[in-house]
Amino acid sequence: MLAKRIIPCLDVREGRVVKGINFEDLRDAGSILEQARFYNNELADELVFLDISASLESRKTTLEEVLKVSEEVFIPLTVGGGISSVERARDAFLHGADKVSVNTAAVYDPKLITRIADQYGSQAVVVAIDVKKVGEKYIVHTHSGKELTKYEALEWARMVQELGAGEILLTSMDRDGTKAGYDNEILREISTSVHIPVIASGGAGNLEHLYDGFAKGCADAALAASIFHFRQYTIREAKEYLRERGIEVRL
């Protein structure tokens, strides 16, 4: 069995790490480089850098910051936000990204996933799926959660797999920043319906939530921000807790 991964996420806006609740009410969470260095030394398996306003503002990811982070960390770095073309993906790779995360642009141009995967390999393409419950259905949203799409979450997850995605980053907008735990219902539904890895995101508030994401949600990796940014827990503490409960992790 592959080891489960713990992945801190740097949501970046205007040169700082920020964290919000339900994609709103952002508060400062520190220096980008300080947080990146901390996680590099803290047994993080990977690091995600998301320029959270790039797609909303129709601009490129802040590549200068990406380059600085890539020079400081020696774990896989995923970069997202404003990756709307193969050229922008290439720029991210040239600035040190190991993977790119596509979200809004892929919904409006699904073949973008294929074009990037054909050039750089599926292993380098993460499709971020932001979902929110609308009635009884989980609906995909874009533009940092501002716009509702025609896709149901499972339908879109299966599509991106066929288009060449190597991984799915599944975020529950309803749970984001609430510390109420991952939405293990949709997480499990998607994780057990696709054969590519699924990263749980949105809602981690304690170590049991991480465990539940793996044990109940069947996730391959758990992404978290608040609990690590504000030093509620260290990644080592999280991994030791998971190992004690029978989850295989790298320590």
Swiss-Prot record:
A GO-annotated cellular component: cytoplasm
Active site location: 11, 130
Family: Belongs to the HisA/HisF family.
Localization of this protein: Cytoplasm
Listed InterPro entries: Aldolase_TIM, His_biosynth, HisF, IGPS_HisA/HisF, RibuloseP-bd_barrel
One Pfam family, short name: His_biosynth
NCBIfam families xref list: hisF (TIGR00735)
CDD domains reported in the protein's UniProt record: HisF (cd04731)
Transmembrane segments: none
Pathway: Amino-acid biosynthesis; L-histidine biosynthesis; L-histidine from 5-phospho-alpha-D-ribose 1-diphosphate: step 5/9
Protein name: Imidazole glycerol phosphate synthase subunit HisF
Keyword set includes Cytoplasm: yes
This protein's UniProt keywords: Amino-acid biosynthesis, Cytoplasm, Histidine biosynthesis, Lyase
EC number, as in UniProt: 4.3.2.10
Subunit structure of this chain's protein: Heterodimer of HisH and HisF.
Catalytic activity: 5-[(5-phospho-1-deoxy-D-ribulos-1-ylimino)methylamino]-1-(5-phospho-beta-D-ribosyl)imidazole-4-carboxamide + L-glutamine = D-erythro-1-(imidazol-4-yl)glycerol 3-phosphate + 5-amino-1-(5-phospho-beta-D-ribosyl)imidazole-4-carboxamide + L-glutamate + H(+)
Gene Ontology MF term list: imidazoleglycerol-phosphate synthase activity; lyase activity
Domain of life where this protein originates: Bacteria
Example GO biological process: L-histidine biosynthetic process
Function: IGPS catalyzes the conversion of PRFAR and glutamine to IGP, AICAR and glutamate. The HisF subunit catalyzes the cyclization activity that produces IGP and AICAR from PRFAR using the ammonia provided by the HisH subunit.
